[in-house]
Regions:
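Non-catalytic C-terminal accessory region of glycerolipid acyltransferases
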Residues: 140-251
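Glycine- and acidic
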Residues: 76-77, 133, 168
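Membrane-anchoring hydrophobic helices of lipid-metabolizing enzymes
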Residues: 1-77, 83-94, 98, 104, ...
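Conserved nucleotide-cofactor-binding alpha/beta core module
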Residues: 106-137, 141
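Short helix/loop capping segments that flank catalytic or ligand/cofactor-binding pockets
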Residues: 88-90, 117-118, 173-174, 214
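A short, conserved acidic/glycine-rich loop-to-beta-strand motif
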Residues: 105-109, 201-204
């Protein structure tokens, strides 16, 4: 953990993001404080919370959440969410959980988003686990079993909650129907039938909504390109641009 942290604080991309959100910060002192942290829980509570509170103050008129009071703080859940923003959907849920005294969730993130080493380090420090998105057809079932097994393990053995998007990729047209293959993947693991396997991981539907979507024009452009060319694939630069605009734009 500490070795990853030492590398992270030297990365220009990380420094740029921190300085943008926390304009008056003494970055050198901030880095010294980071290097005193030695576990993921403290990293989320002491660092990510401050970052996200600053971000919401700067780029929103406020963040609210409903029905968090129905969650049992002693239990772990699979938060299955609609998908609007690459970075913020899970991060803002975790901020709301922290505000309400509920433990944060681990975050499922596609390996296609690990564009730079410092991003890979940051997401792992922030309780993320990697979903393999670039496997061939023959490896897809093995990857699904591995992912399903880990989620069941996290919920039932580690007592950690998990966030996962209800579909692969952000919805570009507000169609939030859950991807059928995701439900099948979650039901692969466990000792019972499909229904009991799904019950085991305590699925909680989550709906997230942004008043304004700073990436709306990017999504519209991508939707148009895919309509005209079904084989169109985004580049890593496209994903990175969407991550930056989503984080820093007003929403």
């Amino acid at each position: 953990f500490h070795d990853k942290m030492k590398v992270l604080v030297t990365e220009p991309g990380f420094e740029h993001a921190v300085r943008y959100v926390l304009r008056d910060i003494n970055y050198e002192l901030f880095c010294q404080e980071l290097l005193t942290i030695d576990n993921k829980k403290d990293f989320q509570l002491l660092v990510m919370r401050s970052f996200l509170e600053g971000l919401t103050q700067k780029t929103t008129k406020g963040l609210t959440g409903n029905n968090l009071d129905v969650l049992d703080k002693a239990k772990s859940y699979t938060f299955m969410s609609n998908h609007r923003d690459i970075v913020l959907d899970a991060s803002l849920l975790n901020l709301l959980l922290i505000r309400n005294g509920i433990k944060t969730s681990e975050i499922a993130i596609g390996n296609n988003l690990l564009i730079y080493d410092w991003i890979s380090d940051l997401v792992r420090l922030n309780k993320s686990f990697i979903v393999k998105r670039d496997v061939g057809v023959r490896q897809m079932l093995d990857a699904a079993r591995q992912l399903s097994g880990y989620i069941h393990f996290a919920i039932t053995k580690k007592n950690e909650s998990v966030w996962i998007a209800q579909r692969e990729g952000r919805s570009k047209d507000s169609d939030d129907r859950t991807q059928e293959s995701l439900i099948k993947m979650l039901g692969i693991s466990g000792e019972g039938d499909l229904i009991n396997n799904l019950k085991e991981i305590n699925i909680v539907p989550v709906s997230i909504s942004y008043e304004y979507d700073p990436c709306d024009y990017l999504k519209a452009h991508e939707f148009l390109l895919k309509r005209d060319n079904p084989d169109f694939k985004k580049s890593q630069r496209d994903d990175l641009h969407s991550m930056e605009i989503g984080l820093l734009g007003f929403k």
